[in-house]
A protein has these predicted regions:
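Fungal secretory targeting signals
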Residues: 1-25
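Short, compositionally biased P/S/T/A/G/V-rich stretches that sit at domain boundaries
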Residues: 18-48
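Short beta-strand elements
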Residues: 21, 116-134
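Short edge beta-strand/loop segments characteristic of extracellular beta-sandwich folds
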Residues: 49-57
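Extended low-complexity, serine/threonine- and proline-enriched intrinsically disordered segments
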Residues: 61-77
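Short, aromatic- and glycine-rich surface loops/edge beta-strands on solvent-exposed regions
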Residues: 66, 102-115
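Solvent-exposed serine/threonine-rich low-complexity stretches and specific carbohydrate-binding patches
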Residues: 72-89
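Aromatic sugar-binding surface patches on proteins
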Residues: 85-94, 119-121
Length: 134
């Protein structure tokens, strides 16, 4: 009885995973708070961590790795985010406080394996300016 039940559950699990994961899936991502090519101000009095928000479309269930490249070329690994469900804002937190950031060009790199689909890598370039508040 148990081997038959186990075989059925195993076969069902394989069927469901193959039905859900699309090997031809192309995962797209879009910046919500920082859009590629635009300039933004950062509050230099804030000691909050830098965050960025992305949405994904057409992705298999997986995670995306986020990296922030500083103007001097240093790379910071930010928290990973889920790539599903579609059109859901996902926030990544980076290990730098806003009051530690300098004015300059930053890159936000978003990459992932896309489950069993096509891997992806996107780059969002943005210029951040320190906003001095007194």
């Amino acid at each position: 009885m148990y081997p038959t039940r186990f075989s059925f559950l195993f076969a069902l699990a394989i069927f469901l995973s193959s039905a859900v994961a699309d090997p031809n899936s192309v995962c797209n991502t879009f910046g919500i708070d920082f859009v590629d090519g635009n300039s933004y101000f950062i509050n230099t009095l804030s000691n909050d961590s830098f965050t960025c928000v992305s949405e994904f479309e057409g992705c298999n269930a997986d995670v995306a790795d986020i990296m922030l490249v500083l103007p001097d070329g240093d790379e910071l690994i930010c928290s990973e985010v889920q790539t599903t469900p579609d059109d859901t804002p996902e926030m990544s937190t980076c290990p730098i406080q806003k009051d530690q950031m300098v004015s300059g060009e930053y890159l936000i790199l978003i990459m992932g394996n896309n489950g069993d689909g096509n891997p992806f890598a996107y780059e969002r370039g943005t210029v951040l300016h320190r906003l001095l508040l007194y």
